[in-house]
Design a protein with these regions (language model features):
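Domain-level signature for soluble enzymes in the chorismate/prephenate branch of the shikimate pathway
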Residues: 1-235
């Protein structure tokens, strides 16, 4: 009994300090050129991974020491992953963000992947305000919003690719699409009628994640801004 009493009254051993794990930021990274540019920037400011994601078929690569995990997704799906909380943050074009009406925080315009949303038509096209405009596009919501803003009624024809073909074959009067250099338009006998939305890649965050991981996100944003500014100065 006394031995047991001594054991119970003995001082407890010191609690071993546990290493606190770094909070992981889950990043939805678009596959392709834009994703490569963004990854190179992030890797340059301490968010790289030991594994080269371009040299693997894996869709998830991570670096726990840096507190970073990348999900490699289709550009059109980035906003979905972030909005629904599968990813904390992501990089997505303003076109996709606007078309999806994603309920996310838009934290930074990276200035990468610059282009513009345009109305384009055959070189000899003349607008007739008295008739319905047939518009071919994959950006249905953006097209409807633009034409509503100028008070025009339209007939939308949703296409998923080769949009330039629609007016050539008489399927539509005009198209609404992204234009970067205009080369594809010119080669197909089309011209820009109106430019109405500048587009570039935006850094977005899930609203709930931002409440819990704002410190990590703000730190990444600060470093990313500095890297983008340094990149701009080199031009």
């Amino acid at each position: 009994y006394l031995d047991e009493l001594d054991r119970l009254s003995a001082p407890l051993p010191p609690v071993q300090q546990q290493k606190t794990e770094k909070t992981m930021l889950n990043v939805a990274l678009p596959k392709g050129r834009l994703g490569d540019k963004v990854y190179d920037l992030l890797a340059g400011i301490g968010y790289g991974c030991p594994e080269d994601y371009n040299a693997t078929r894996k869709l998830v690569v991570e670096n726990p020491a840096a507190g970073i995990r990348y999900f490699l997704v289709k550009p059109s799906d980035v906003a979905i992953y972030v909005e629904h909380g599968a990813a904390d943050v992501g990089i997505v074009g303003k076109d996709i963000l606007t078309e999806a009406s994603a309920d996310v925080y838009e934290l930074l315009d990276t200035g990468l992947g610059k282009c513009r949303m345009c109305v384009a038509a055959p070189a000899d096209y003349k607008d007739d305000p008295s008739r319905l405009v047939r518009v071919a596009t994959k950006f249905v919501s953006i097209a409807k919003s633009y034409y509503a803003s100028i008070g025009r009624d339209i007939d939308i024809i949703k296409l998923n690719g080769s949009i330039e073909l629609a007016p050539i074959l008489g399927l539509s009067d005009v198209i609404v699409d992204i234009v970067e250099t205009g080369t594809t338009l010119r080669e197909n006998g089309l011209r820009v009628v109106t430019e109405f939305m500048p587009i570039s890649a935006r850094f977005i965050a899930n609203k709930a994640s931002y409440q819990f991981k704002h410190r990590e996100m703000d730190e990444m944003l600060e470093k990313l801004r500095a890297a983008l500014a340094a990149k701009e100065e080199k031009k």
